[in-house]
């Protein structure tokens, strides 16, 4: 009998409408994405970048630890020896379609050369645009250097 009265007086609909009215006048929790952006965690793993020293020389010493530790095998490195005996990369490619953004390459790097930056807006229509070469990675590093340095400084206690 009680179930009949509840269905006769549309109890479920009234209950649903009161819940809707309860939240109707409260402030919105959604963000108008392209125009508003939510804060990003300092430990966020985004687009990759290769960093340089203050004198402009690239940090990568071609130890290939990042290539060895990458579980997705997304990193390809070729190196050559310089006249002074040090090694530097001649090719540093990352296939971003394979990358799983685990951050192991960043953790393995002894000189903080490869880092995952704050940028997450790098969508593309073609596969070839998501294969990053050394120049693009260095440009990302130059573009985001201040943010990358701050990120590494904040994250230092966890490393």
Swiss-Prot record:
Binding residue positions for [4Fe-4S] cluster 2: 70, 99, 102, 105
UniProt-listed SUPFAM superfamilies: 4Fe-4S ferredoxins (SSF54862)
Binding site for [4Fe-4S] cluster 1: 60, 63, 66, 109
Enzyme Commission designation: 7.1.1.-
SUBUNIT field: NDH-1 is composed of 14 different subunits. Subunits NuoA, H, J, K, L, M, N constitute the membrane sector of the complex.
Main location class: membrane
Cofactor: [4Fe-4S] cluster
Name recorded for this polypeptide: NADH-quinone oxidoreductase subunit I
Enzyme category, top tier: translocase
Single GO cellular component term: plasma membrane
Protein family: Belongs to the complex I 23 kDa subunit family.
All residue ranges annotated as the 4Fe-4S ferredoxin-type domain in the record: 51-80, 90-119
A GO molecular-function annotation: iron ion binding
Highest taxon in the source lineage: Bacteria
Organism annotation: Rickettsia prowazekii (strain Madrid E)
Biological process, per Gene Ontology: aerobic respiration
Keyword Transferase listed: no
Record localization: Cell inner membrane
Catalytic activity, reaction form: a quinone + NADH + 5 H(+)(in) = a quinol + NAD(+) + 4 H(+)(out)
